[in-house]
Amino acid sequence: MTKRYWNIDLEEMMRAGVHFGHGTRKWNPRMAPYISAKRKGIHIINLTRTARFLSEACDLVFDAASRGKQFLIVGTKNKAADLVSRAAIRARCHYVNKKWLGGMLTNWSTTEKRLHKFRDLRTEQKTEGFNRLPKRDAAVLKRQLSRLETYLGGIKYMTGLPDIVIILDQQEEYTALRECITLGIPTISLIDTNCNPDLADISIPANDDAIASIRFILNKLVFAICEGRSSYIQNS
């Protein structure tokens, strides 16, 4: 994998609060190599390590995108939902930003059926098929469509399992991470000081609570994906 320069600036990371971990009582000892200090009762993340692993992750997604691979971004915290959808759409990635439905990947055949149902209902709505139904039946189908849009809207164009999954909060998205591990899907995960750094293929130590920190990491990854996609288009 070719190493590239991604302009990952330590001062910019500090301004985004990437270095702020959790309280010192709420930590995973396996995170010790990624912690540089304790300050006012919280752990401080070593940003040199963050920059190294973020750079590795950018190299990985660039290479994958330049070969036409598919990505799934998972971040279901309410405050990050809009950020996730905007970033994913910009990089033409699939995303889950509301709730991870158990078995979404490990029970892919069921997910496919839901996606087919979702597409059928969207077609019905666009062709005004609901207007030809009794009001009660139309209301039931509209509720179904609304629910499917909420939970599957970000993966509506997904036709198979993703090649790489980006997870923005290891603890919040633990079910998604376990499904990826079960299926052998490579993962990139943000890890705060209360996380296990050994679960993902590339773990990026960072504050996973502050929106500015999440935005900084995600923007770097999305930029690398977009650059890789441009390379793929030029070479195809």
Swiss-Prot record:
It is found in: Plastid, Chloroplast. It comes from Arabidopsis thaliana. One of its GO terms (cellular component) is plastid. This is Small ribosomal subunit protein uS2c. InterPro entries: Ribosomal_uS2, Ribosomal_uS2_bac/mit/plastid, Ribosomal_uS2_CS, Ribosomal_uS2_flav_dom_sf. PROSITE patterns: RIBOSOMAL_S2_1, RIBOSOMAL_S2_2. NCBIfam families: rpsB_bact (TIGR01011). HAMAP family: Ribosomal_uS2_B. It comes from the Eukaryota. Belongs to the universal ribosomal protein uS2 family. The keyword Cell inner membrane does not apply. GO terms for molecular function: mRNA binding; structural constituent of ribosome. Keywords: Chloroplast, Plastid, Ribonucleoprotein, Ribosomal protein. The keyword Disulfide bond does not apply. One of its GO terms (biological process) is translation.
